Regions:
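Short, small/polar-rich motifs associated with maturation and membrane association
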Residues: 1-416, 421, 428-430, 504
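Surface-exposed loop/interface segments of Gram-negative outer-membrane beta-barrel transport/assembly proteins
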Residues: 112, 127, 240-362, 373, ...
Length: 625
């Protein structure tokens, strides 16, 4: 034996090095002053081999042998022993000073993941499974602090591909063994027997067990809806220990971009790149290069010159003074309607703002403008308890994540309550309920080169952030890239929001009239709602692409789904080596009972004040409903 492992509740795993052990020590990992305590660990079937016994608050511990026996040396007075084993309720035993020999009988807890797997509409011993099923332990899911279950599953199961949007909400795409043709290639998600659940509404801390059914033999019972694989989640239930356990789990942290952006040309380098292109046209083609709209033509030093003003073509400082009389007059001539919306180039604007020559030559770093270190936090309070007559569990969770792109965020509030009641040894009833409210903002669903991140490398670095009137620069600069700048796109979304509500509730009853026969019925409902609001600003005032009017868009929809599942299962065993399970069942579903509404109004006078973003405040001309 080279090392012994001890595990106690949420305590970390500890390893203790040991050398050669004499027979009278019987595998005890530590030798120190104090008394010797002998424990015998068993369950209703007999001794338990490999149970962990730890003296709470110390590194004194050991593992039970073939007889369920554990010997601990150096146990202090008034010690508390923590006895644990996978699949059983962890017990804490307070030792009296006179107690040197104790017996501990462990009670079975929830399904042990490595022994029993949830498949289809029941459970099965893992050794009896012939299909492809991946089991992910809750310990693995907790390894990384994440906001959603799908993020926690990444890299935990073979054959499961997960990609996300990169935003704080962690919107994901899950594929099991490739792409299918039904249900948009998405796998079927089953939570506590309820199908088609929104997994992002499931708090990862509420998960008790997780199985991924991957091949046809494992998913066949679900029919066509399981063609792309099935993910089965069982949430935490109460215990029959007779004790109440209250726990808190939380963390604070930060979210950062994995890299510092692309290695792009800065403002001065971009100008030199244009100059080299012109030289190549002249020297290798023998042609006169076309003047650049901003940098003009090559000067007598065979170089280009950074313009002072950009709109739509570049002007030097002397040209501005010649045309307007002075720089002050040029600034005073600014008009937000686009007829005279001038901007200084980023180089001159940064010099004006007090930056050094070296910094000004770099121009605008759009990546730095729109990225940040986001703050993240997650908190959960949970309650578990119960006894022989029933069990209960409840949890309250809160998640708040700032995205690494400014203005992006994700919040979730969740409440879960599960309970069972054993009326007698034949009849059990129970319920599993969960409600989650989520809010997210930023990105407006933009993809490709219209996204904030894509614009960090499509907008030229010589374009400034603001024009001389304080509005966003960009759309008036010829060859500046997209009309929108990355910063403008991000800031125009800072007051947008989308809110989701997900309510899932299931009630079940189970009758066991004779040995081996289980009759179960479960009725569940899922209520889903979505509300969103976004104001798109005008083209000129804030340089939005392709819009001459601002407009407010609001969306609202809700949907109610029903599911009724009935199963009869009979399990028997013969010749001690053969287990046979028969199951028949029916399932009725009704999806899509609900309504969706959308409205658009134009011409909001105070577009920068979200308090005025009310449909009735907009113009009814060309309105859309």
């Amino acid at each position: 034996l080279g090392a012994s492992l001890f595990l106690c509740g949420a305590s970390p795993v500890m390893a203790t090095e040991v050398g050669d052990l004499t027979p009278d020590v019987r595998g005890n990992a530590l030798q120190q002053d104090g008394r010797r305590v002998t424990c015998v660990i068993s369950d209703k079937a007999g001794p338990i081999v490999g149970a962990n016994v730890l003296v709470k608050g110390t590194t004194i511990g050991n593992i039970s042998d073939m007889d369920g026996r554990v010997i601990l040396d150096g146990v202090p007075d008034n010690a508390i022993l923590v006895v644990s084993y996978i699949g059983y309720v962890t017990q804490e035993i307070s030792l009296k000073n006179s107690q040197n020999n104790i017996k501990v009988k462990l009670a079975e807890d929830t399904q042990a993941l490595d022994e029993v797997v949830v498949v289809g509409y029941g459970t099965q011993a893992k050794k009896d499974i012939t299909g492809s099923v991946a089991v992910v332990s809750t310990e693995e899911l907790k390894e990384t602090p994440v906001a959603t279950f799908s993020e926690a599953l990444q890299g935990k199961a073979s054959g499961v591909y997960i990609s996300n949007s990169g935003g704080p909400s962690g919107e994901t795409t899950i594929r099991i063994r490739g792409v299918g043709s039904l249900n948009g290639s998405d796998p079927l998600i089953v939570v506590d027997g309820v199908s088609n659940v929104d997994i992002d509404a499931v708090n990862p801390n509420d998960i008790e067990s997780l199985q991924v059914l991957k091949d046809a033999s494992a998913t066949a019972i679900y029919g066509a809806q399981g063609a792309n694989g099935v993910i089965i989640i069982t949430t935490k239930q109460g215990t029959k220990s007779g004790r109440v356990r209250v726990s808190y789990d939380g963390y604070f942290g930060v979210a950062k971009m994995a890299n510092s952006g692309y290695d792009l040309l800065n403002g001065w380098e971009a100008m030199e790149w244009q100059a080299q292109g012109m030289r190549n046209v002249r020297d290798y083609r023998g042609q006169t290069p076309t003047a650049h709209p901003q940098f003009g033509s090559l000067n007598d030093k065979d170089e280009l010159t950074m313009p002072y003003a950009i709109k739509p073509a570049g002007l030097s400082k002397d040209q501005v003074i010649s045309q307007f009389g002075s720089i002050d007059a040029w600034v005073a001539s600014y008009k937000p309607d686009g007829s005279n919306s001038w901007s200084r180039s980023a180089y001159y604007q940064m010099l004006e703002d007090g930056y050094s020559e070296a910094e000004a030559q770099k121009g605008t770093n759009w990546y730095d403008m729109v990225t940040r270190t986001g703050k993240v936090q997650d908190h959960q309070i949970s309650l578990l308890g119960g006894g022989e007559k029933g069990t209960y569990s409840a949890s309250l969770g809160y998640t708040n994540r700032e995205g690494t792109i400014i203005s992006s965020f994700f919040k979730r509030y969740s409440l879960r309550a599960n309970s069972t009641y054993n009326a007698n040894k034949y009849f059990t009833i129970g319920q599993n309920s969960n409600i989650a409210v989520m809010e997210m903002g930023g990105e407006r669903g933009r993809q490709g080169d219209a996204s904030v991140f894509a614009q960090t490398y499509t907008i030229q670095p010589w374009v400034p952030v603001y024009n001389v009137g304080g509005d966003y620069a960009g759309s008036q600069a010829s060859e500046g890239g997209r009309a929108n700048t990355a910063y403008q796109t991000a800031m125009n979304q800072q007051d947008d929001w989308t809110r989701f509500m997900r309510l899932q509730s299931a009630a079940f009853a189970e009758l066991n009239p004779i040995k081996g026969l289980s009759l179960r019925t479960q009725f569940s409902v899922r209520l889903m709602g979505m509300w969103s609001q976004a104001l798109s600003e005008k083209t000129i005032a804030t340089n939005k692409e392709g819009q001459s009017q601002n407009y407010l868009e609001e969306n609202a929809n809700w949907r109610l789904d029903y599911q009724w599942t009935n199963t009869a299962t009979y399990k028997t065993k013969f010749n001690e080596d053969h287990d046979v399970t028969f199951m028949i069942g029916t399932e009725a579903m009704k999806f899509g009972v609900g309504r969706s509404m959308k409205a658009i109004r134009y011409d909001y006078i105070f577009e920068n004040n979200p308090n005025t973003w009310i449909l009735n405040n907009g113009s009814s001309d060309n309105m859309k409903n």
